[in-house]
Design a protein with these regions (language model features):
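Short functional hotspots at interaction and active-site rims
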Residues: 1-216
Length: 216
């Protein structure tokens, strides 16, 4: 059932104010790593923000941010409209569904070198991605920025970039918030939930269509 916009806004407002004191509303809590409180990590993040980021803004055409994220064939919309006091239900596969890993690069104007594997990312898969997908798509002098994970610290992958006159630059530990590709993934998953692909082939098609339409 579809509700008029003014009614939908009223329901959303009432959900918030019903559990508030007039100035504070109960909302979902975000979590950050407790390890960020360590002095060495605080300094590393400060150095990144005050020294590296200004240089990045001066030469954005040289940057590619990469990361991986899980994509599933049971994605569905998580929110909708309903009268106050009534639950809202939807349908999604609870039994047979698949989880894949999607890895891609974010430039200043596009998503490049998208790649999907079944299961979790590991060292050999990451090496293959860099060698066969990402490195051939890079211009000489490109800096590839990524999370500080052991899987990413591969001599084989670094060699593949070096052969293209490119190199890795690792983010401070526990700092995914410093990688703008996280915002791209948020948009991408919102589209996937809207599309609701239920097979691997349909998921691949949806990811390709989204990447082609993406505008950072």
């Amino acid at each position: 059932m579809h509700w008029p916009r003014h009614m939908a806004w009223r329901y959303s407002f009432l959900r918030c104010t019903a559990r508030s004191n007039g100035t504070v509303c109960h909302i979902k809590k975000g979590l950050i790593a407790a390890e960020r409180d360590q002095s060495a990590l605080r300094q590393a993040r400060l150095d990144w923000i005050t020294h590296r980021q200004p240089r990045m803004r001066a030469e954005p055409h040289r940057l590619v941010f990469i990361d991986e994220t899980a994509v599933k064939t049971n994605f569905t919309r998580l929110r909708g409209r309903a009268p106050v006091g009534e639950r809202l239900y939807g349908t999604a596969p609870f039994g047979k569904w698949g989880t894949q890993t999607f890895i891609v690069g974010l430039t200043q104007n596009a998503l490049i070198a998208p790649w999907v594997i079944n299961g979790a990312m590991n060292g050999p898969a990451f090496d293959t991605y860099i060698e066969t997908q990402l490195a051939p798509a890079l211009d000489p002098g490109t800096v590839v920025i990524l999370d500080n994970l052991s899987t990413h610290k591969s001599p084989r992958a670094a060699k593949a970039l070096k052969e293209r006159s490119c190199w890795f630059l690792f983010l401070p530990a526990y700092s995914p918030d410093l990688n703008p590709i996280e915002m791209a993934f948020s948009k991408l998953k919102a589209h996937l939930r809207r599309i609701g692909a239920r097979t691997f082939d349909a998921l691949l098609q949806a990811l390709g269509d989204i990447c082609n339409l993406f505008d950072p």
